[in-house]
C-alpha cells in the first residue's frame, strides 16, 4: 500500500497534536512558535489528509520541516506510536548533587557537551543508559517504518532541490563578494564558532537532514536490527551522527511549574511565589524582566548551540540578577534560560560563582510559566480553536531533554517534578538514491 504525505495548515493540525499530549509536545510547540513567527520555507506534513482525523487503530506520522534552518534543527517528527506504544524501563532518580548548570538539549553528539567528559564523575559513574522503545506488533512497526521512509522521500524529492539551489546561489554570491576587500572584518566569524569563539556543533551535510528530538524508537526503525545502534542501517539510509547515549526527555505538568491557585500570586506579580535566595531578583534595577537584547552576546558566549540572536529574541526567557550597591549601567544577569522554538527548556545557565545556591529550580519554573501562560507563545491564547478542551490542554505540559549522564541537571528537573517518559536523539540522516 502506497503511503501518501499531505501538506497541512499549521493551525488546523494543532487539535490533533493536543490530543496526543504530552508525547507530541515538541512538534506541537514548534508549530505554535512557527505560527507566531512564520517562515515561508516551513512545511507541515502528515500521513493523513488535511481536514480529517487519523484513522483509529492505525499509526500515523506528522512533521514540521524547514530545510532552510540549516545547522539548527531542520525537522521535527512525531509518530502516534509514541503515545500508544512507548516502553521505557524504570529510571532511578539521581541523588542530590551540586548545581553545575549549562543545560542545552540540542547537541548533535554527546561528546559536544559543555562539560569535559573525562573530568565529569557523573559520566564515569554510569555504565548503562536507558533507551525507550516501541512495544507494538511487527506489522505496526513495519507500517510506521514505511511512513517514516515515505516522509524522508517526500522531503528529498519536493524540498531538497530548492534548498540545494539556494545554497549554490548563496555560495556563488559569497564568492563574488569575497573578491572585493571588506571595509572591516571584525564581525566576521567562522562557521564553526560563535561570536566569542566558542566551538559550535558542526553543520549537517546539505544532502542530509538534521532531525531533532527524535524518539529512539523511531530511530531504531531505521536499523535492520530494530535496536538503537549505528551498526547496520536499513538499505538507502546513511546515519551521519546521532546521540549515544540518547537524551532523557523530562515532562512537567502545569501543576508543577504553574499551579492554578497560589497564595499571593496575581496577574501583576506572576512570579511572586517563586522564591529566589536572598539577594537575587527576577528583574534588573529598572524593573525589566527577561533576557534583554543587550544580554544576548553574553548568552551566546556560554553555549555551543548555534542559536542566532534573532532566534533568541523570539523565544520566552527569564533572567536572574544579583542585588548590588553598584550603579553600573551595564547590569548583567548571573543566570538565565529560555523555552526554545520547540518549547523545550534550553540554555539554562548559572554563572559558576552563583551555582549551588538554589537558583535553577525557581528560574526554570519562571521560564516555563512565562512561555506557557495564556498570553505566552505556547499558551491557550495562541490557539485558534473554539474547543474549550483543546485550549485548556494546549499549555498543560512543558518539557526538556537532558543527557543521561548529566546528574546535576537531571536532579534539577526532578526537583521541579519532571518525569522521564521517553528518550530522544538529535541525528543527521541521509536518504540515498
From Swiss-Prot:
Pathway: Secondary metabolite biosynthesis; terpenoid biosynthesis; Mycotoxin biosynthesis. It is an enzyme of class 2 (transferase). One of its GO terms (biological process) is terpenoid biosynthetic process. GO terms for molecular function: transferase activity. Acyl-CoA N-acyltransferase; part of the gene cluster that mediates the biosynthesis of the neurotoxin verrucosidin, a methylated alpha-pyrone polyketide that inhibits oxidative phosphorylation in mitochondria and thereby causes neurological diseases. The carbon backbone of verrucosidin is synthesized by the HR-PKS verA, and further modified by the other verrucodidin cluster enzymes. InterPro entries: Acyl-CoA_N-acyltransferase, Acyl_CoA_acyltransferase. Keywords: Transferase. The lineage of its organism: Eukaryota, Fungi, Dikarya, Ascomycota, Pezizomycotina. Its EC number is 2.3.1.-. It comes from Penicillium polonicum. This is Acyl-CoA N-acyltransferase verG.
